[in-house]
Amino acid sequence: MPRFAGFSLPNADLRRKHAAMQKIDEEALAEAYNRALALEKSGDVEAAVKAYEEVLAIDPDDHGGAAVRIASMGRGETPDKAPDAYVATLFDQHADVFEDVLVEQLDYHVPMLVRQRLQALTLGPFARVLDLGCGTGLTGSALRDMAEDITGIDLSENMVEIAHEKDVYETLYVAEVVDFLEDNDDEPFDLVTATDVLPYLGALEALFFGAAENMNAGGLFIFSSETLPADTFAGRSFMVGPNQRFAHAETYVRERLDAIGFDIVELTDITVRKEEGAPIAGHLVIARLR
């Protein structure tokens, strides 16, 4: 049976955020957020931005992702990541229907692509695997017979509880992935995965460095990302796309991996998922730590 563990520092942060949410005027917040969303949908960008700023004044921790929505409209500063409170709230609320929506409705199959590419390149089996942003255990399940020991990390407690029920992981933590990588003192891993994690992160340096610090030399780091046409970035390394998820320029991903000590084994163009029936372009990257 997996050991369902809580990572003390990130969990303390989550409890503080939950306590802060309890102090918010939820009725006022819902009214302000719905007003901002209606203005955004109407196409009144400037009014929507102002309304989302009012949302942030009520809820500085940003459980509704107002800062990300502002950035998706091309206004304000692009945040380095989606707010932890937003990510935890989003996935806690949707945990029960997550797999049905993501796999069945949005045609998300990245975990199986990970398995297929590892097998095609005859990589593995692996003694120790770290599954960052493990969610309900889709990637862990896809790799279960390729690994002796799998550790899963996710910011959403409800998602981790579902992963725990699957009996896929030896160890599970509720934690923000970069915080975990910074504080972890377990034995290093042979494979680190991060499927559907980068769309909630803008700047990648801390993630890539943390992964490297938790891996054996020669270990593999495999992750998916979303992207946009090169000219859309206008020289930027990353941006929030129209679907409120971070997209990363391929050049940025390549440069950061190399600078931190990874060699790219393979970078493949993929369809990450569908959004309103349209394919979302992305990459599946396999990198080896030097």
Indicate where each model-derived feature is located.
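A short acidic, Gly/Pro-enriched loop at the edge of an enzyme's catalytic core
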Residues: 182-192
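Short, glycine-/aromatic-enriched active-site segment of Class I SAM-dependent methyltransferases
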Residues: 225-246
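Conserved beta-strand signature within the Rossmann-like core of class I S-adenosyl-L-methionine
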Residues: 218-226
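A short SAM/SAH-binding and catalytic strip from SAM-dependent methyltransferases
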Residues: 190-204
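A short glycine-rich, Lys/Arg-flanked "PGG" loop and its adjoining helix->strand segment in the class I
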Residues: 205-217
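Class I SAM-dependent methyltransferase SAM/SAH-binding core
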Residues: 128-130, 135-181
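N-terminal auxiliary segments of SAM/dcSAM-dependent transferases
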Residues: 22-88
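Short alpha-helix
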Residues: 245-261, 267
